[in-house]
Amino acid sequence: MPIRNIAVGSHQEVYHPGALKAALAEFISTLIFVFAGQGSGMAFSKLTGGGATTPAGLIAAAVAHAFALFVAVSVGANISGGHVNPAVTFGAFVGGNITLFRGLLYWIAQLLGSTVACFLLRFSTGGLATGTFGLTGVSVWEALVLEIVMTFGLVYTVYATAVDPKKGSLGTIAPIAIGFIVGANILVGGAFDGASMNPAVSFGPALVSWSWESQWVYWVGPLIGGGLAGVIYEVLFISHTHEQLPTTDY
């Protein structure tokens, strides 16, 4: 059971060179992802005169985020696991695959990466505002359910393709599968709540623009969805090896 595998770890872990390198990898991967994802939306809006919220803008956002996440996960996979998302890190924690202290280190790196990406975008685009997440035609509770379900699908995909020790050669396509599910979910939820699935992705633009409306939805929803996916996959589908009982010949 994952609850028995959950580990707090030691505070000294945050100073370990391996943990610091992993955190740096998360910072860089998240910066790459947010810069490309947010930047594509800003560029599309500039070229179309505010058309980022049109059907074409939604498709462009889905494709850009899918490609960017594919790259971000790939470049970080061998160093940190390529989480690029506090909800993925939380799902790994509740499944017993990362310690609390290392997970918190990842969170800090991911939030910093998103924030720096948004500041860089604002500076390099002549002061254009980064796109913040908001609700359109749905209540906060409906948006919360959307974020839970979409993030569940994302973290479940992460477990199936990257975490499961039985994944075999499937692990080679993990970044592609993870990018695809995010792109597909953006097509589903983008028109309603922006389809964050990632607290870091919504935190950076909110901080830079200082716009916190419904921000809690983009934390609570992904963390619930990611946590549920981690526990369910770990409990139901990851087999734990047991020592065979000795046999006696009569």
Curated annotation (Swiss-Prot):
Sorted UniProt keywords: Membrane, Repeat, Stress response, Transmembrane, Transmembrane helix, Transport, Vacuole
Keyword Repeat found: yes
Alphabetized PROSITE patterns for the sequence: MIP (PS00221)
The keyword Acetylation is assigned to this record: no
GO terms, biological process: water transport
Compartments it resides in: Vacuole membrane
Tissue spec. comment: Expressed in roots and leaves.
Residue ranges annotated as motif NPA 1: 85-87
GO-annotated molecular function: water channel activity
The record's note on its domains: Aquaporins contain two tandem repeats each containing three membrane-spanning domains and a pore-forming loop with the signature motif Asn-Pro-Ala (NPA).
Family, similarity comment: Belongs to the MIP/aquaporin (TC 1.A.8) family. TIP (TC 1.A.8.10) subfamily.
Protein name: Probable aquaporin TIP1-1
Organism whose genome encodes this protein: Oryza sativa subsp. japonica (Rice)
Gene for this chain: TIP1-1
